[in-house]
Amino acid sequence: MIRVALLFSLVLVSGCSSPRPTPRPDLNGLLRQSVNSRRDPSLGGRWLASLGQRNGRERVELIDLRSRSPVPLPGLNRADAQPISVSVSADGQRLAVVQQREDRTELVLYRRNVGATQRLPLDPPGVPRRVSLDGSGRRLAVQVSRNGRWDVDLIRLPLSLIHI
């Protein structure tokens, strides 16, 4: 009887243990080799957007996790802009970026299909700090500083910025 109880306890304990997270050494090694440092990751489907530092300068990088290769982002990484936060849509077509440019912090939307950014004004005005783009690429959550207080704004993007 004791053996049955012990066996039953062992089955219960092993059945209740949660699976362990599985690191991806192949992808992690690739990510470490491509830049000196990387921060602010955002996953969207098969896409990983992050801020990578190379040669003392940070830039937005997009990695296609299926092909394990970086994706060109023409028109996004400007010499006069310092990215602060990035988020990618599930289809990898839109990236929302908070960046410091010409002594102001701004929120921009980058559309890969046209290779251009568009500034997104905040109403009421404030200083954006972090951004999160939903999987559909239609809505943003933005952490904003206003009058010494942190707020979160939810923004629905206009249809003209959504359609590819």
Q: What is each residue range found by the language model?
A:
Residues 13-30:
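Bacterial Sec signal peptide processing site at the extreme N-terminus
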Residues 29-35, 74-79, 121-125:
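Surface loop/turn motifs at the tips and blade-to-blade linkers of beta-strand repeat domains
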Residues 39-41, 86, 131:
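Hydrophobic core register within WD40 beta-propeller blades
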Residues 46, 91-93, 136-138:
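Short coil/turn segments that connect the beta-strands within blades of beta-propeller domains
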Residues 49-55, 96-102, 141-147:
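Beta-strand C-termini and the immediately following turn/loop, strongest in propeller blades
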Residues 57-61, 103-108, 148-155:
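Structural motif
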Residues 64-68, 111-115, 157-158:
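Short loop/turn segments that connect beta-strands within beta-propeller blades
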Residues 162-164:
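Conserved small/polar residues in nucleotide/adenosyl-binding loops
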